[in-house]
């Protein structure tokens, strides 16, 4: 595999991807970031088995391939590189060589086949709302999520689409928070409970800009 990207694009995608890298795990492969250049896009994937993140990185693919690299080591290398073009090349021994100007790093990788891939999402009719709106709805309800994990449902938020409204509900046994917004078109009724940890990370990723939109493709895997 050989890909060429600008440092700024790599760093942006790695920063987002790190939010789905577990701090502790019995599966070392989950500490990795999957770099997939087997198609016409460069994709970074991380997965802690609760939250999975896939980002598309702007760049050029000169040789197709796939590799899993330790996410934190990869981040530290990219962070310290000069603000210029970065080349990532792998060999048959799964060794990755990262070069930028006069800087050169070599780190061992793992087979992409061992990685915990994200589930294939069956795309329903996508719900499109502004990133600002979703970020605000999460912010105004997440404080009522229970911290006690004896009741898993209370550690998440209910997302429900019904009667042309999106409703988000959280409760911890003592208080309840509800936020509703009218949708601009009709959608089929559906609902799902999303873990609070996942929503916290999603909220950090959302830009908070009114003009930026987010497409919710499925309320099974949100």
Tell where the protein language model's regions lie, with residue ranges:
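Structural preference for solvent-exposed beta-strand-turn elements
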Residues: 1-220
